[in-house]
């Protein structure tokens, strides 16, 4: 039997940090922004941070993995 090799690409979910902070402070939001993307685990072993548009905040914010 052949070995099952994990690929270099993994699917990740990016969430808005501003929406998460507002939910933690007690402010109720209707929803928060979540993007789905892929990353290469060998090129970027650390957590990914991208600046994306958040529709619930209506501005560009940092989204973290």
From Swiss-Prot:
This is Large ribosomal subunit protein bL33c. Coiled coil: none annotated. InterPro entries: Ribosomal_bL33, Ribosomal_bL33_CS, Ribosomal_bL33_sf, Ribosomal_zn-bd. It is found in: Plastid, Chloroplast. SUPFAM superfamilies: Zn-binding ribosomal proteins (SSF57829). Belongs to the bacterial ribosomal protein bL33 family. Gene3D superfamilies: Ribosomal protein L33. GO terms for biological process: translation. It holds the Pfam family Ribosomal_L33. Its main location: plastid. One of its GO terms (cellular component) is ribonucleoprotein complex. Keywords: Chloroplast, Plastid, Ribonucleoprotein, Ribosomal protein. GO terms for molecular function: structural constituent of ribosome.
């Amino acid at each position: 039997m052949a070995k099952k090799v994990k690929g270099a690409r993994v699917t990740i979910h990016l969430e808005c940090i501003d929406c998460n902070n507002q939910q933690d402070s007690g402010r109720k939001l209707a929803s928060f922004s979540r993007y789905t993307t892929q990353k290469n685990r060998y090129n970027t072993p650390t957590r990914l941070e991208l600046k994306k548009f958040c529709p619930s905040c209506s501005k560009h914010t940092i989204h973290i993995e």
